[in-house]
Protein backbone atom coordinates (compact mmCIF):
# COMPACT_ATOMS: atom_id res chain seq x y z
CA UNK A 1 0.00 0.00 0.00
CA UNK A 2 1.38 3.40 -0.98
CA UNK A 3 0.11 6.89 -0.34
CA UNK A 4 -0.10 8.68 -3.66
CA UNK A 5 -2.05 11.39 -5.41
CA UNK A 6 -2.90 11.48 -9.12
CA UNK A 7 -0.81 13.82 -11.25
CA UNK A 8 -2.59 16.91 -12.46
CA UNK A 9 -3.98 16.73 -15.96
CA UNK A 10 -2.61 19.25 -18.39
CA UNK A 11 -4.60 21.06 -21.03
CA UNK A 12 -4.64 19.53 -24.51
CA UNK A 13 -1.44 20.15 -26.41
CA UNK A 14 0.70 20.80 -23.32
CA UNK A 15 3.37 18.50 -21.96
CA UNK A 16 3.84 17.46 -18.32
CA UNK A 17 6.13 20.44 -17.65
CA UNK A 18 3.31 22.90 -18.40
CA UNK A 19 1.03 24.41 -15.80
CA UNK A 20 -1.72 21.96 -14.77
CA UNK A 21 -5.41 22.72 -14.81
CA UNK A 22 -6.36 24.47 -11.55
CA UNK A 23 -9.18 22.00 -10.95
CA UNK A 24 -6.73 19.39 -9.54
CA UNK A 25 -5.71 21.45 -6.50
CA UNK A 26 -9.36 22.22 -5.79
CA UNK A 27 -10.11 18.48 -5.81
CA UNK A 28 -7.37 17.82 -3.25
CA UNK A 29 -8.85 20.43 -0.92
CA UNK A 30 -12.36 18.98 -1.13
CA UNK A 31 -11.68 15.25 -1.50
CA UNK A 32 -9.12 14.69 1.25
CA UNK A 33 -6.03 12.48 1.07
CA UNK A 34 -6.38 9.55 -1.32
CA UNK A 35 -4.46 6.31 -0.75
CA UNK A 36 -4.18 4.15 -3.84
CA UNK A 37 -3.47 0.43 -4.00
CA UNK A 38 -1.71 -0.40 -7.26
CA UNK A 39 -1.33 -3.70 -9.06
CA UNK A 40 1.88 -5.07 -10.56
CA UNK A 41 4.01 -3.55 -13.33
CA UNK A 42 4.80 -0.24 -11.64
CA UNK A 43 7.27 2.04 -13.39
CA UNK A 44 9.22 4.74 -11.56
CA UNK A 45 9.54 8.15 -13.20
CA UNK A 46 11.66 10.84 -11.56
CA UNK A 47 10.92 14.43 -12.57
CA UNK A 48 12.92 17.45 -11.45
CA UNK A 49 10.59 20.39 -10.78
CA UNK A 50 11.80 23.94 -10.35
CA UNK A 51 9.70 25.83 -7.81
CA UNK A 52 9.76 29.55 -7.08
CA UNK A 53 9.12 30.32 -3.42
CA UNK A 54 9.55 33.77 -1.88
CA UNK A 55 11.69 34.83 -4.82
CA UNK A 56 14.07 31.88 -4.39
CA UNK A 57 14.38 29.09 -6.95
CA UNK A 58 14.24 25.63 -5.41
CA UNK A 59 14.67 22.32 -7.23
CA UNK A 60 12.51 19.44 -6.04
CA UNK A 61 12.79 15.84 -7.23
CA UNK A 62 9.37 14.21 -7.44
CA UNK A 63 8.94 10.48 -7.88
CA UNK A 64 6.02 9.30 -9.98
CA UNK A 65 4.74 5.80 -10.56
CA UNK A 66 2.76 4.44 -13.48
CA UNK A 67 0.56 1.42 -12.93
CA UNK A 68 -2.94 0.02 -12.81
CA UNK A 69 -5.27 1.55 -10.25
CA UNK A 70 -7.42 -1.06 -8.52
CA UNK A 71 -9.11 0.87 -5.73
CA UNK A 72 -8.54 3.83 -3.49
CA UNK A 73 -9.29 4.92 0.03
CA UNK A 74 -10.43 8.42 0.91
CA UNK A 75 -9.05 9.55 4.25
CA UNK A 76 -10.76 12.21 6.33
CA UNK A 77 -10.14 13.01 10.00
CA UNK A 78 -11.76 10.11 11.85
CA UNK A 79 -13.15 8.49 8.71
CA UNK A 80 -11.89 5.95 6.16
CA UNK A 81 -13.99 5.16 3.08
CA UNK A 82 -13.14 2.45 0.55
CA UNK A 83 -14.26 3.32 -2.97
CA UNK A 84 -14.02 0.75 -5.75
CA UNK A 85 -13.19 1.82 -9.28
CA UNK A 86 -12.55 -0.04 -12.53
CA UNK A 87 -8.86 -0.72 -13.11
CA UNK A 88 -7.41 2.16 -15.09
CA UNK A 89 -3.87 3.21 -15.92
CA UNK A 90 -2.78 6.42 -14.20
CA UNK A 91 0.40 8.27 -13.38
CA UNK A 92 0.64 8.84 -9.66
CA UNK A 93 2.81 11.32 -7.81
CA UNK A 94 4.31 9.84 -4.65
CA UNK A 95 3.86 11.68 -1.35
CA UNK A 96 7.13 11.27 0.52
CA UNK A 97 7.89 11.90 4.16
CA UNK A 98 9.62 15.14 3.21
CA UNK A 99 6.37 16.75 2.09
CA UNK A 100 5.25 19.36 4.58
CA UNK A 101 1.54 19.79 5.18
CA UNK A 102 -0.07 22.99 6.45
CA UNK A 103 -1.27 22.89 10.04
CA UNK A 104 -5.01 23.14 10.53
CA UNK A 105 -6.16 26.14 12.50
CA UNK A 106 -8.65 25.62 15.30
UniProtKB/Swiss-Prot annotation:
Superkingdom of origin organism: Eukaryota
Tissue distribution of the protein: Expressed exclusively in testis. Expressed in ejaculated spermatozoa of germ cell. Expressed in the nuclei of spermatogonia, spermatocytes, and round spermatids, except elongated spermatids (at protein level).
Protein's GO biological process: single fertilization; spermatogenesis
GO molecular function, one term: HECT domain binding
GO cellular component: nucleus
UniProt family annotation: Belongs to the VCX/VCY family.
Assembly notes: Interacts with MAP1S. Interacts with UBE3A (via HECT domain).
Protein name, entry field: Testis-specific basic protein Y 2
Gene source species: Homo sapiens
Gene that encodes the chain: BPY2
